[in-house]
Swiss-Prot record:
Residues 92-118 are annotated as: Disordered. One of its GO terms (biological process) is translation. InterPro entries: Ribosomal_uS19, Ribosomal_uS19_bac-type, Ribosomal_uS19_CS, Ribosomal_uS19_SF. Pfam families: Ribosomal_S19. Belongs to the universal ribosomal protein uS19 family. This is Small ribosomal subunit protein uS19c. HAMAP family: Ribosomal_uS19. The keyword Nucleotide-binding does not apply. One of its GO terms (cellular component) is small ribosomal subunit.
């Protein structure tokens, strides 16, 4: 469910104050925050913000395209390790079978070629 149109977008009070102070002093320092639910405002554009993802802080630069999105969208909380796929042991076993089959085929070819030469 979306936020009511009567309410303004949420931003952490502490985060808003630090960015406002940095804008007044023309500073561009890294800001650390745990507020993933804060909305990106136009005053934040150009600042480097590090958002906590539960394990460590993920830094990124705020761009114009990020306005009105949440800070949590830019720091992943889960790592994608890939789909299950084929087991590597099965691949090794199947490759061994193929090489054995190739060797047996070569032996058969040699024996049949000897038979035809006679």
């Amino acid at each position: 469910m979306s936020r009511s149109s009567k309410k303004s977008p949420f931003i952490s009070y502490r985060l808003f104050n630090t960015i406002d102070k940095m804008n007044l002093k023309n500073l561009k320092q890294l800001v650390f925050t745990k507020s993933r639910s804060s909305t990106v405002f136009p005053s934040m554009v150009g600042h480097n913000i590090s958002v906590y993802n539960g394990k460590n802080y993920v830094p990124f630069l705020i761009l114009n395209q990020m306005i009105s999105s949440k800070l949590g969208e830019f720091s992943r909380t889960r790592n994608f390790r890939g789909h299950k796929g084929i087991n590597k042991k099965l691949i090794k076993k199947s490759s061994k079978k193929v090489t054995k089959n190739k060797k047996s085929i070569k032996k058969n070819i040699k024996t049949t070629s000897k038979k035809f030469k006679k």
